[in-house]
Protein backbone atom coordinates (compact mmCIF):
# COMPACT_ATOMS: atom_id res chain seq x y z
CA UNK A 1 0.00 0.00 0.00
CA UNK A 2 1.19 3.48 -0.88
CA UNK A 3 0.16 6.73 0.75
CA UNK A 4 -0.53 9.43 -1.83
CA UNK A 5 -0.83 13.21 -1.51
CA UNK A 6 -2.87 14.26 -4.58
CA UNK A 7 -3.15 17.93 -5.57
CA UNK A 8 -5.97 19.16 -7.81
CA UNK A 9 -5.77 21.23 -10.99
CA UNK A 10 -6.68 24.88 -11.67
CA UNK A 11 -10.42 24.17 -11.74
CA UNK A 12 -10.31 23.16 -8.09
CA UNK A 13 -11.05 19.95 -6.22
CA UNK A 14 -13.64 18.61 -8.67
CA UNK A 15 -15.68 15.44 -8.34
CA UNK A 16 -13.51 13.98 -11.13
CA UNK A 17 -10.32 14.45 -9.10
CA UNK A 18 -12.08 12.89 -6.11
CA UNK A 19 -13.22 9.97 -8.30
CA UNK A 20 -9.62 9.39 -9.41
CA UNK A 21 -8.56 9.36 -5.74
CA UNK A 22 -11.37 6.89 -4.96
CA UNK A 23 -10.10 4.58 -7.72
CA UNK A 24 -6.70 4.53 -6.03
CA UNK A 25 -8.32 3.90 -2.65
CA UNK A 26 -10.28 0.97 -4.08
CA UNK A 27 -6.94 -0.49 -5.16
CA UNK A 28 -5.82 -0.39 -1.50
CA UNK A 29 -3.96 2.92 -1.28
CA UNK A 30 -4.40 5.77 1.17
CA UNK A 31 -5.02 9.07 -0.66
CA UNK A 32 -5.09 12.61 0.72
CA UNK A 33 -6.90 15.21 -1.43
CA UNK A 34 -6.38 18.67 0.07
CA UNK A 35 -8.44 21.56 -1.29
CA UNK A 36 -6.00 24.39 -2.00
CA UNK A 37 -8.89 26.58 -3.21
CA UNK A 38 -10.95 26.28 -0.01
CA UNK A 39 -14.10 25.06 -1.76
CA UNK A 40 -13.87 27.19 -4.90
CA UNK A 41 -14.21 25.47 -8.27
CA UNK A 42 -14.18 26.99 -11.75
CA UNK A 43 -15.57 26.12 -15.16
CA UNK A 44 -12.57 27.33 -17.19
CA UNK A 45 -8.81 27.21 -16.91
CA UNK A 46 -8.71 30.99 -17.33
CA UNK A 47 -10.97 31.56 -14.30
CA UNK A 48 -9.00 29.09 -12.22
CA UNK A 49 -5.71 30.72 -13.15
CA UNK A 50 -7.14 34.15 -12.34
CA UNK A 51 -8.05 32.84 -8.88
CA UNK A 52 -4.54 31.45 -8.41
CA UNK A 53 -3.02 34.77 -9.54
CA UNK A 54 -5.04 36.65 -6.89
CA UNK A 55 -3.26 34.64 -4.20
CA UNK A 56 -0.04 34.23 -6.18
CA UNK A 57 1.34 31.11 -7.85
CA UNK A 58 4.22 30.83 -5.38
CA UNK A 59 1.94 31.19 -2.35
CA UNK A 60 -0.57 28.69 -3.73
CA UNK A 61 2.24 26.20 -4.42
CA UNK A 62 3.68 26.73 -0.93
CA UNK A 63 0.22 26.22 0.58
CA UNK A 64 0.35 22.71 -0.85
CA UNK A 65 3.92 22.17 0.31
CA UNK A 66 2.99 23.20 3.88
CA UNK A 67 0.15 20.67 3.95
CA UNK A 68 2.73 17.90 3.64
CA UNK A 69 4.22 18.92 7.00
CA UNK A 70 1.26 17.22 8.70
CA UNK A 71 1.89 13.92 6.89
CA UNK A 72 4.58 11.21 6.87
CA UNK A 73 7.65 11.71 4.68
CA UNK A 74 7.37 8.50 2.62
CA UNK A 75 4.56 9.75 0.40
CA UNK A 76 3.85 9.49 -3.29
CA UNK A 77 3.33 13.07 -4.45
CA UNK A 78 0.79 13.44 -7.25
CA UNK A 79 -0.67 16.39 -9.08
CA UNK A 80 -3.09 17.17 -11.87
CA UNK A 81 -1.78 20.10 -13.98
CA UNK A 82 -1.44 23.07 -11.56
CA UNK A 83 -1.24 20.50 -8.75
CA UNK A 84 2.05 19.31 -10.24
CA UNK A 85 3.69 22.47 -8.85
CA UNK A 86 3.49 21.44 -5.17
CA UNK A 87 3.72 17.71 -6.00
CA UNK A 88 6.90 18.03 -8.02
CA UNK A 89 8.48 20.44 -5.54
CA UNK A 90 7.81 18.01 -2.69
CA UNK A 91 9.05 15.01 -4.68
CA UNK A 92 12.27 16.82 -5.52
CA UNK A 93 12.97 18.58 -2.22
CA UNK A 94 11.28 16.80 0.70
CA UNK A 95 13.42 13.97 2.10
CA UNK A 96 11.85 10.52 1.99
CA UNK A 97 9.67 10.94 -1.10
CA UNK A 98 8.50 7.53 -2.25
CA UNK A 99 7.56 8.49 -5.83
CA UNK A 100 5.87 11.12 -8.00
CA UNK A 101 2.92 11.13 -10.39
CA UNK A 102 2.83 14.17 -12.68
CA UNK A 103 -0.43 14.29 -14.64
CA UNK A 104 -1.11 16.88 -17.40
CA UNK A 105 1.98 18.93 -16.49
CA UNK A 106 5.70 18.77 -15.77
CA UNK A 107 8.27 21.32 -14.61
CA UNK A 108 11.86 21.40 -15.85
CA UNK A 109 14.71 20.06 -13.74
CA UNK A 110 17.10 22.69 -15.07
CA UNK A 111 16.69 26.40 -15.71
CA UNK A 112 14.46 29.09 -14.20
CA UNK A 113 11.45 27.01 -13.07
CA UNK A 114 13.55 24.19 -11.69
CA UNK A 115 13.71 22.80 -8.16
CA UNK A 116 17.02 21.18 -9.11
CA UNK A 117 17.89 17.77 -10.55
CA UNK A 118 15.56 14.81 -10.16
CA UNK A 119 16.49 13.04 -6.90
CA UNK A 120 18.01 9.57 -6.98
CA UNK A 121 15.72 6.81 -5.79
CA UNK A 122 12.44 8.65 -6.51
CA UNK A 123 10.50 6.90 -9.29
CA UNK A 124 8.27 9.11 -11.44
CA UNK A 125 5.51 8.70 -14.01
CA UNK A 126 4.39 11.56 -16.26
CA UNK A 127 1.05 11.34 -18.12
CA UNK A 128 -0.34 13.70 -20.79
CA UNK A 129 -1.95 13.80 -24.22
CA UNK A 130 0.39 14.01 -27.19
CA UNK A 131 -1.32 17.10 -28.67
CA UNK A 132 -2.30 18.88 -25.44
CA UNK A 133 -1.61 22.55 -26.28
CA UNK A 134 -0.51 23.26 -22.70
CA UNK A 135 1.70 20.19 -22.19
CA UNK A 136 3.23 20.19 -25.67
CA UNK A 137 2.93 23.88 -26.56
CA UNK A 138 4.31 25.29 -23.30
CA UNK A 139 7.36 23.05 -23.00
CA UNK A 140 6.17 20.55 -20.40
CA UNK A 141 6.89 17.71 -22.81
CA UNK A 142 10.53 18.81 -23.05
CA UNK A 143 10.78 18.93 -19.25
CA UNK A 144 9.26 15.44 -19.07
CA UNK A 145 11.73 14.09 -21.62
CA UNK A 146 14.62 15.61 -19.65
CA UNK A 147 13.45 13.81 -16.51
CA UNK A 148 13.09 10.52 -18.39
CA UNK A 149 16.59 10.91 -19.85
CA UNK A 150 18.25 11.64 -16.50
CA UNK A 151 16.24 9.89 -13.76
CA UNK A 152 16.92 6.24 -13.00
CA UNK A 153 13.22 5.22 -12.85
CA UNK A 154 11.07 7.51 -14.98
CA UNK A 155 8.39 7.00 -17.61
CA UNK A 156 6.51 9.39 -19.89
CA UNK A 157 3.14 8.16 -21.13
CA UNK A 158 1.56 10.07 -24.01
CA UNK A 159 -2.06 9.38 -24.95
CA UNK A 160 -3.58 10.27 -28.34
CA UNK A 161 -5.56 13.50 -28.17
CA UNK A 162 -5.45 17.18 -27.37
CA UNK A 163 -7.39 17.48 -24.12
CA UNK A 164 -5.60 18.89 -21.10
CA UNK A 165 -7.80 17.50 -18.30
CA UNK A 166 -8.55 14.16 -19.95
CA UNK A 167 -8.40 12.21 -16.66
CA UNK A 168 -11.07 14.26 -14.82
CA UNK A 169 -14.37 12.40 -15.26
CA UNK A 170 -16.42 15.45 -14.24
CA UNK A 171 -15.32 17.55 -17.22
CA UNK A 172 -16.28 17.59 -20.93
CA UNK A 173 -12.59 16.99 -21.77
CA UNK A 174 -12.71 13.55 -20.10
CA UNK A 175 -11.43 10.69 -22.26
CA UNK A 176 -12.68 7.44 -20.73
CA UNK A 177 -10.30 5.15 -22.64
CA UNK A 178 -7.16 7.20 -21.99
CA UNK A 179 -8.15 7.77 -18.37
CA UNK A 180 -8.73 4.05 -17.78
CA UNK A 181 -5.27 3.26 -19.17
CA UNK A 182 -3.70 6.03 -17.07
CA UNK A 183 -5.44 4.75 -13.93
CA UNK A 184 -4.30 1.18 -14.61
CA UNK A 185 -0.70 2.34 -15.10
CA UNK A 186 -0.82 4.43 -11.93
CA UNK A 187 -2.20 1.56 -9.85
CA UNK A 188 0.50 -0.79 -11.17
CA UNK A 189 3.12 1.86 -10.38
CA UNK A 190 1.80 2.31 -6.84
CA UNK A 191 1.94 -1.45 -6.27
CA UNK A 192 5.70 -1.50 -6.92
CA UNK A 193 6.94 1.69 -5.23
How would you describe each model-predicted region?
Residues 153-193:
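C-terminal catalytic histidine-bearing segment of alpha/beta-hydrolase fold enzymes
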Residues 120, 126-128, 159:
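Short beta-strand/loop motif that positions the catalytic acidic residue
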Residues 9, 125-134:
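Conserved strand-to-loop "acid loop" that flanks and positions the catalytic carboxylate
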Residues 79-83, 87:
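Gly/Ala-rich beta-loop-alpha elbow adjacent to hydrolase catalytic centers
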Residues 77-79, 103:
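Short beta-strand immediately N-terminal to the catalytic nucleophile in serine-hydrolase-like folds
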Residues 133-142:
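Conserved alpha/beta-hydrolase "acid-adjacent" motif
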Residues 96-107, 123:
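A conserved short beta-strand
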Residues 2-72, 166-167:
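Serine-hydrolase catalytic machinery in alpha/beta-hydrolase-like enzymes
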Amino acid sequence: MSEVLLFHHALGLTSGVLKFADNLRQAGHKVHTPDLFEGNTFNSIEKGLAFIEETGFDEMRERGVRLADELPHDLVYAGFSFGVLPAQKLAQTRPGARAALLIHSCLPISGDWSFGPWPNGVPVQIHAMDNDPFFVGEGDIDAAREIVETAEDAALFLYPGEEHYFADSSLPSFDAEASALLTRRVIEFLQRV
